[in-house]
Amino acid sequence: MAWISLRIDARDDNAELLSDTLMELGALSASIEDANAETPDEQPIFGEPGDPPPGIWQQNVVTALLDESADLDSLLEELSAATGITDFRYSTETIAEQDWVRATQSQFEPIRIRDDLWIVPSWHDAPNPDGLNIVLDPGLAFGTGSHPTTHLCLSWLADTVKPDTSVLDYGCGSGILAIAARKLGAGKVVGVDIDAQAIQSSVYNADQNQVDASFYLASDLPGGQFDIVVANILSSALSVLAPALARAARSGGRIALSGILREQADQVSAIYQEWFEMDAPVFMDSWVLLTGSRR
């Protein structure tokens, strides 16, 4: 059996309409993606914590999966009639039957961060069994560790973590930074997130890596200060959380902030200068790592 993948260019004001209508017309699935994803023009969507979702991207691709027997011309006519959109720009691709689990796994290879620090999919042999290998299951939510901000934070941790230092990973997601800190020799390691599924993912991944770390929902986080605070989250959230992250860092402690675009770096850095002596920013592609020392 085969399928047809239909990709339609869409604006921010019609992408959801197209996606919903395609499902009503019998599509097996429909999704919306940033048309500029994984390019320098990628458009992150930011919103203040607690605010409603700010919307979708300005330029989108709506992808629908259709049965191979679908009459594409008739479908597009019905789609146009139902939405009032007549100027579709689209492309199609035939997708053959295959072992989807194996196909998905083949997309993820071990990622070398630096030296012998690796991110290794759980089903893959480690390129260096004696290296510092962080085992992740990319089938879980909260990322695979391939994003530039993850690279920036992991490389910084490798330079900064000393034996028995305490580390707070705020916005732990998959737990990758907390797990790395523990494997790099940190003592007390705590991860925190606002999403219960992130906590479950972090606990699972920590168990996979046989490391001892504690994970809490933000509302349940015990008090205390840390030698190192790292937060790889949205820049808007970093701005709001600055006082809390400053309280979590002991005097002389270190902080690392990412999830920040180049054009947002000055604004975020200025906020944290109230509590930290900020270092020169480090860049990777269009992303920034900000670090500093607690006064």
Swiss-Prot record:
**Main location (coarse class):** cytoplasm
Provide one Gene Ontology cellular component.
cytosol
Q: Which domain of life is it from?
A: Bacteria
- Enzyme Commission numbers on file: 2.1.1.-
Q: According to its UniProt record, where is this protein located? A: Cytoplasm
Cited InterPro entries: Ribosomal_L11_MeTrfase_PrmA, Ribosomal_PrmA_MeTrfase, SAM-dependent_MTases_sf
**Which reactions fall under this protein's catalytic activity?**
L-lysyl-[protein] + 3 S-adenosyl-L-methionine = N(6),N(6),N(6)-trimethyl-L-lysyl-[protein] + 3 S-adenosyl-L-homocysteine + 3 H(+)
Query: What sort of enzyme, by top EC class, is this?
Result: transferase
Listed A to Z, the keywords are: Cytoplasm, Methyltransferase, S-adenosyl-L-methionine, Transferase
Q: Which family does it belong to?
A: Belongs to the methyltransferase superfamily. PrmA family.
Free-text function comment from the UniProt entry: Methylates ribosomal protein L11.
The molecule here is called: Ribosomal protein L11 methyltransferase
Q: What is the lineage of its organism?
A: Bacteria, Pseudomonadati, Pseudomonadota, Betaproteobacteria, Nitrosomonadales
Task: Give the encoding gene's name.
Answer: prmA
